[in-house]
Swiss-Prot record:
EC number: 2.1.1.-
EC primary class: transferase
Pfam families: SpoU_methylase (PF00588)
Source organism (scientific name): Danio rerio (Zebrafish)
Family: Belongs to the class IV-like SAM-binding methyltransferase superfamily. RNA methyltransferase TrmH family.
UniProt GO cellular component terms: mitochondrion
Positions of S-adenosyl-L-methionine binding: 387, 411, 420
One Gene Ontology MF term: rRNA (uridine-2'-O-)-methyltransferase activity
Keyword field contains Transit peptide: yes
UniProt name for this protein: rRNA methyltransferase 3B, mitochondrial
Transit peptide stretch: 1-37
Taxon lineage: Eukaryota, Metazoa, Chordata, Craniata, Vertebrata
Length: 445
């Protein structure tokens, strides 16, 4: 009996030892499982102290591993992941959940022929800056918006600096010189997002923001556009955007040497001017906001300056045998508007100190010969002044023509027609001037 009791005690001790060892092994396994790092996730069933420790560790590491998170990860699988150690769904902490959501909602990237581009998600408001730049004259002092493949290609070929380019079609992007867009932020958008700000009936597939170009920094290819003729166009207070754009387009088509614009002309980078000019801004030098002193300095000393007379009210009936009246003063022509000029600088001057353009011209102007536009009037470098339809030619324009022995070029019209549109008159005279210059064989085509 005693032997039997001793045997039972021995077996019980062994069982107790084995039981204790098994419990320790289970505790070790549980301890190891609890200490196991789960990247970015915490189980719901784990103790609060350990959860806080893991969250603090992953929070410290999240800033270092943001770049390792795959941008194409499915958002649903991130929001409701499953722990490998727990069949129940696990949860992110509030901070880490927001970080991951921000990463997955970021702009994704793509590539076209080695050119990286961003792909904006729908509803992105970055396109709103296009409307702000296009509608603000102050912002256009530094940036301009160009719309359409033709205009953007012309700007890039001339050396203009593109800052941001938006496109809605990969095929349209491939038509651009991609090698000139390596330093440009290229963004893919949906067509409907671009249509929100565009004023065109048919939205373009390419829209770009450029640093405002300067004529001195652009290059104009003679191989592509041909050699320019020695003919300079001067725009005197042309304020209609459509007219100015058409004038610039005619000047580019006629191969003019340059275009000079006085202060008071409409902004050449306004959208309506850009659309009407059809890329003329990047085919020849266009220099805006000049005083008449600046204009004189931009012209060769031997240049002869003529003015366009697109009105016929003072000439009566015209035919091929009509000889224009000569040696008339500028004030004799009704199309020269009655601008007023103040002879003194103070506001309290007597009203008699104000004189109209007509009075000024009667007293001070020399005679300005008038001739039909199709008779010879070019010799060497020639300049032509076109006035705006509202205000006509200024006093300074007439004085410059008189100083250089220029003439008034008359475009005859049938009775009952008062005048020609400024853009039409410019086109007629510029192409006539080109024809005469080429006929002199002073340049080669």
């Amino acid at each position: 009996m005693a032997t039997r009791i001793a045997s039972m005690r021995f077996r019980c001790a062994l069982f107790q030892s084995a039981l204790t060892l098994g419990r320790n092994e289970v505790n070790i396994k549980r301890y190891v499982r609890r200490r196991r790092a789960v990247s970015g996730v915490v189980s719901v069933n784990e103790p609060t102290e350990i959860s806080e420790g893991v969250i603090s560790q992953t929070s410290e590491r999240s800033s270092q591993h943001n770049n390792d998170i795959t941008r194409n990860t499915d958002k649903s699988s991130i929001e409701n992941p499953v722990s490998p150690n727990n069949s129940q769904p696990v949860q992110f902490s509030h901070i880490n959940r927001q970080k991951v959501i921000n990463l997955t909602s970021r702009t994704r990237f793509g590539e076209v022929d080695g050119l990286l581009y961003e792909k904006l998600h729908p509803g992105d408001k970055s396109l709103a800056k296009l409307a702000r730049i296009a509608g603000s004259k102050k912002l256009r002092e530094h940036q301009v918006v160009l719309e359409g493949k033709h205009l953007v290609c012309s700007a890039l070929d001339a050396g203009a600096e593109a800052q941001t380019l938006y496109f809605s079609s990969v095929d349209a992007l491939r038509e651009l010189p991609l090698d000139k867009l390596r330093q440009t932020n290229v963004v893919k958008v949906k067509m409907e997002d671009a249509q929100v700000w565009s004023e065109l009936d048919t939205s373009q597939e390419i829209i770009a923001i450029f640093k405002r170009p300067e004529a001195s920094r652009l290059t104009f290819s003679e191989e592509k556009y041909g050699r320019a003729v020695p003919l300079t166009l001067i725009c005197d207070t042309v304020r209609d955007p459509g007219n100015l754009g058409s004038v610039l387009r005619s000047a580019a088509a006629a191969g003019c040497h340059s275009v000079l614009l006085t202060k008071g002309c409409v902004d050449i980078w306004e959208l309506k001017v850009l659309r009407a000019a059809m890329g003329a801004h990047f085919r020849l030098p266009i220099i805006p906001n000049l005083t008449w002193t600046d204009i004189s300095n931009h012209l060769p000393k031997t240049s002869t300056v003529h003015v366009a007379d697109n009105h016929s009210t003072t000439m009566g009936k015209h035919n091929d045998n009509t000889t224009p009246q000569k040696h008339r003063r500028p004030s004799d022509y009704g199309w020269v508007k009655g601008h007023q000029y103040q002879s003194k600088a103070h506001d309290d001057d007597d009203a008699n100190d104000l004189c109209s353009l007509e009075d000024y011209c009667d007293e001070n102007s020399k005679s300005l010969e008038t001739q039909l536009y199709y008779t010879d009037w070019v010799a060497g470098h020639t300049s032509l002044i076109i006035g705006g339809e509202t205000h006509g030619l200024s006093r300074e324009a007439l004085q410059l023509a008189e100083r250089t022995s220029g003439r008034r070029l008359l475009i005859p019209m049938v009775d009952g027609v008062d005048s020609l549109n400024s853009a039409i008159a410019a086109g007629v005279l510029l192409f006539e001037g080109r024809k005469q210059l080429l006929s002199l064989e002073k340049i080669r085509v």
